[in-house]
Every structure is written in C-alpha cells, then in structure tokens.
Curated annotation (Swiss-Prot):
Pfam family, one: Maf
Protein name (database record): 7-methyl-GTP pyrophosphatase
Site feature location: Important for substrate specificity: 13, 71, 153
Keywords: Cytoplasm, Hydrolase, Nucleotide metabolism
NCBIfam families reported in the protein's UniProt record: maf
Gene3D superfamilies named in the record: 3.90.950.10
Length: 191
C-alpha cells in the first residue's frame, strides 16, 4: 500500500500539475509567513518556503508524505512577489520588458523521519513590451496571483522570447521532474 500523499497547497495550478503523476493525493492549506528574511536570496527564500509549507502540513498529519513548493521570481537578484494589484503588475511587466527573469522553484517532500528537497532554475527572456501590449495582456489575463505578473500556461507565453529550463513544469509552480525523482527516492511507485 502506498503511503498517504498530501500537497501542501491550495493552488489549482499545482494540483493540476501533481495529478499528471497519477498518484492519489489530498491537499492541505499551509499556514506560513511568506515574507523574506533580511538579505535572503531569492533561491534561499523559495527553498525555505517550500520546506516550511510542507512542514506546516506534515505536523498535522503524522505518517503522511507532504509536498511543499514555492516559486520566487527575481530580476537582477531582486525578488519579485505576486503583484496583487494591476498597478503593481504593470510595474513588474514594464521592469521585465526586454530582460531575463529568473524563476527559482523549490520543492520539498517531508515524510516519516525524512526530508527531501530540490530546486529548479528557469530563465525567461521577455521580449520588449510596449505599454499598450502590457495593458492588452492585463485586460485579457490579469495574473495578479502569479510571480512575475504572467501565466506562462496561458496568454502570458506571448510575452516571451525564450525559456531556458530543465523542467518546463517548474515555471507553472511545481517542478515535476525533480518531484518525481524525490517521490521515487521516498518509495513511491512511478515509471
């Protein structure tokens, strides 16, 4: 019998991605403070938050394996949060126009007496965007809940010149290649 698997997230995007691995799982809401610590690098922030999310749910469900994931976008080493407002999304997209944005996507798998962690780096080269293009994009797909102010799985892909990544699912928020490796290491049966 396979151990119980929990996704420590309420994100529909992550739930949809995890379902691609064809494992039964439940979800749990992680209650963590997502504020960066002073001087914390974007990759360290993503790794810490992924681990904290998994741990926050694992403590409530002893014996289960819990997946936590987090993504932090950075432009020139400066973390970009979820915009939350249209004005902030406009500002982020304007700042990223014609530039490369790095997305640090971390995943943690916490189970009985064991923790496994991975980190994926994806680089997105945005094309030069006009203010009108930014407005049209935000009218069509206001990605206010997404790091970087776009949804790569939707119309946001039209903002890109290129993506460099070992794992295309990482940009959506859950690096399945790394997660599948961690799950196999933990004893889950995957091809």
């Amino acid at each position: 019998m396979m151990p119980r698997l929990i996704l420590a997230s309420t994100s529909a995007y992550r739930r949809q991605l995890l379902s691609r691995l064809q494992l039964e799982f439940d979800t749990g809401r992680p209650e963590v403070d997502e504020q960066p610590q002073s001087g914390e690098a974007p990759s360290a922030l993503a790794s810490r938050l992924a681990a904290e999310k998994a741990a926050a749910v694992a403590v409530r469900l002893p014996g289960a394996w819990v997946i936590g994931s987090d993504q932090v976008a950075d432009l020139d080493g400066q973390a970009l949060g979820k915009p939350g407002t249209r004005a902030q999304a406009q500002a982020q997209l304007t700042a990223m126009s014609g530039r490369t944005v790095r997305f640090h996507t971390a995943v943690s798998l916490i189970g009985p007496e064991r923790e496994l962690h991975a980190l994926d780096l994806t680089e997105v080269q945005l094309r030069a965007l006009t203010p009108a293009e930014i407005e049209r994009y935000l009218d069509a797909e206001p990605a206010l809940d997404c790091a970087g102010s776009f949804k790569c799985e939707g119309l946001g892909i039209s903002l890109f010149d290129a993506i460099r990544s070992q794992d295309p699912t990482a940009l959506v928020g859950l690096p399945l290649i790394a997660l599948a490796r961690l799950l196999r290491e933990a004893g889950f049966h995957l091809p």
